[in-house]
Each structure stands twice: as C-alpha cells, then as structure tokens.
Amino acid sequence: MADFLLYALLAGLSLALVAGPLGSFVVWRRMAYFGDTLSHAALLGVALGFALDVSPALAVTVGCLSLAILLVTLQQRQPLASDTLLGILAPSTLSLGLVVLSFMHDVRIDLMAYLFGDLLAISTTDLAWILGGSALVLLLLAVLWRPLLAVTVHEELAMVEGLPVAGLRMALMLLIAVVIAVAMKIVGVLLITSLLIIPAAAAQRHARSPEQMALGASLLGVTAVCGGLAMSWFKDTPAGPSIVVCAAVLFLLSLALPKR
C-alpha cells in the first residue's frame, strides 16, 4: 500500500473512532450548530496561522479552543439566544478568515483543501497531529464518560449530585474544538460536523444504550471512511466529500431498516 494511502487510512480511522462517542453527545445535546460555528472559525485559524507564521494546525487548535471559551462566556453574559449568537459568529469568523487570506498575496494557499479537506496529501507531521489529538480526546472521553452522560440526561439532577455541570459542559465543548481542529485536514472546515453528526444519527435509531450508540457511530464512521477512500481511489473523487457521501448513504440505509 502506498504511504500516502496508508496515512490517509490511519488518519481517517482514528477520527472516525473518536467521532463516534463525541458525535453522540453532539446529537444528544443538540450541539450541531455549535460544531458548525467552530468549524467555520477553523478557517480564521488557518489565516491567522499564515499571517503570524505559525503552524496552521496549531493556530486552528488554539483558535477553536479560544472560540469555544468565548462562546460559553457570551452565552452566560449576553441576553441573546444561543442559536442567534452562533448564527452571528459562524458566518462572521468564516468571512473574516477569507478576508484575511485575500490580503496574503505572497502566500500560496490551496483554499479548497482547507474547505473540503485533502486527506490524500497528509504528511507524517499531519498524521502524528491527528493520531495524538484523537488519542487525547478518546482518553478524556473515557474518563469523563459517566459524568458527561449524567449531565446530558438531567443537568439539574447532576447538579444536585454535586457534579461540576458548568465545567463538564465546557470540557465537552473543548473536546469538540480539538476534534474539529484535527479533522480539518481530512474533510475540511465545511464538512467536519457531518462526520460527527451523520454516523451518530444513524446509530441512534438502532441503539439500546448510550454505549451501543457510541460504538455503532464509530463503526459506521469507520465504514464511511473506508468506503470514501475506496471511492476516491477507484473513481478519482475528492476523498473528504466521498467520505461524507458514504456516511449519508449509511444514514439513509439506517432509515430503511426497522427501528429497534
């Protein structure tokens, strides 16, 4: 197997494994729009990375984490509804990123690769970044699984039981930010949340427990990655969108199957 294809497969599979349980929380807590806002802000992180001459991956990670903290702070202090606030920040950060990039005449940037991913162009450094970020998020999810689940099921009861609800909510948002940052190279900023939401939504119909849903979402994500890479290899289609198309097909198939 060619090195670039092996790197793409390892990166895609690692992201699919972590997107399963994390995407389940996104679906349960109806945080899809939050994920969209962070993914749009990732392009601003890319632009600032080039402007400040730092690694785009590092700039995107710092940018997504900073925006997640800003969102939580604004939600607590502003009278605006959450969806209104997200609706303002999502297009604003994406547009600002595009404007900043337009001023960089001396920097050659493949904008399509950042918007829709360039999985087959992953380098050794990119792979290490993706594997490390995915492993960290999986480890933290394993540690925080029960408390996060308790907060998701009933926040008031979790608060009565002494769980740090605000801290856990912030932790979940930061984990989403990390995954979005590492996933940008795979499916691009415009398609990142689809890899979080679609497998989890497909698994939700047929799972009998939260753990079953998380595992099912991971397996569906792995299937979508393998199918998307195969389509890209044999039909010369873009890898990121091909993965999302395969995930969408799996979701449609889940609708056709009887609900458990």
Q: Model-predicted segments: where are they?
A:
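C-terminal binding/interaction regions
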Residues: 1, 115, 119-120, 220-257
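Membrane-interfacial amphipathic/re-entrant helices at transmembrane-helix boundaries
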Residues: 1-17
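Transmembrane helix-bundle core of multi-pass membrane transporters
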Residues: 6-7, 78, 86-146, 174
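Loop-to-transmembrane alpha-helix initiation sites
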Residues: 8, 56-64, 83-87, 131, ...
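Short loop segments and helix-boundary regions at transmembrane helix junctions
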Residues: 24-107, 203-216, 232-235, 258-259
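Small-residue-rich segments of transmembrane alpha-helices in multi-pass membrane proteins
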Residues: 41-51, 89-101, 121, 165-177, ...
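Helix-loop-helix "hairpin" substructures at the membrane interface of multi-pass membrane proteins
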Residues: 127-199
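Transmembrane alpha-helical segments in multi-pass inner-membrane proteins
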Residues: 190-241
